[in-house]
Amino acid sequence: MSEESRNHRKVYQGRVVSDKMDKTITVMVETYKTHPEYGKRVKYSKKYYAQDDNNEAKVGDVVRVMETRPLSRTKRFRLLDVVEKAVII
């Protein structure tokens, strides 16, 4: 099935913060919310575990992950694609 036929699933873009596990990456997704009273934008971040079958994503890469069925106790996302590779200095 393609991504277009699964429109109801959430797709997030975030940065890989860990790839030490086999076939699993940790992705940090940052979002902004506006404070209801003061109107200031506040940054929120959340970490998600995602399935990476080919171990292609590395730390620092910007990736897109899509919601899927539960793959383990904590894993509910799978890697769609690597948007931007990390620059190695």
Curated annotation (Swiss-Prot):
GO molecular function: rRNA binding; structural constituent of ribosome
UniProt xrefs under Pfam families: Ribosomal_S17 (PF00366)
TM stretches of this protein: none
Entry keyword set: Ribonucleoprotein, Ribosomal protein, RNA-binding, rRNA-binding
Domain of life: Bacteria
GO CC terms in record: cytosolic small ribosomal subunit
GO biological process: translation
Biological role stated in the UniProt entry: One of the primary rRNA binding proteins, it binds specifically to the 5'-end of 16S ribosomal RNA.
Listed NCBIfam families: PRK05610.1, uS17_bact
Family: Belongs to the universal ribosomal protein uS17 family.
Subunit structure: Part of the 30S ribosomal subunit.
The protein's name in its UniProt record: Small ribosomal subunit protein uS17
Organism (species): Latilactobacillus sakei subsp. sakei (strain 23K) (Lactobacillus sakei subsp. sakei)
